[in-house]
């Protein structure tokens, strides 16, 4: 069975400033585009059997820039719905909720179009996505690539390893990086994390 490759989109103005960016559709910065372009040799070193991408423009542009042009858009790859914390930094949230932590405390309710998600709800989406990944891996001898978002991919990694969604907190994930999840003796493992070309 092939590897599961995770690509976090390149930098945006909001990711650079630490603002929670769930459903707000912000573009990549020029630095974010360069981060993505520099991943091309790493992507080309793998045989790609299937690819999926979040609907957001930052993820779709990253997919295009890394040379993955036939990725299937899948809403299960959307970033965590931050509800009332959309666009707010952790520092600002903690001014009113000291000790607040996304992976255990969740988010404040938001408007009807993005009401917010609990860690468990994000975990359920990750499980659905992993079922699609496993079906794709069974149908090809290549790797499957997911181009998506930091917090969601951290939860997905935890679920791949059999951990609760809150354990996504253990996996710091930088913009414009590649991660590789594989298997050892039939069990899921992290084979590479936050991989970047040396010149970045």
Language-model segments: residues:
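Loop-to-helix element that buttresses phosphate recognition and phosphoryl-transfer chemistry
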Residues: 8-62, 112-127
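Short, hydrophobic/glycine-enriched beta-strand segments
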Residues: 3-9, 146
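Acidic, low-complexity terminal tails and accessory targeting/binding regions
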Residues: 1-2, 81-92, 135, 139-142, ...
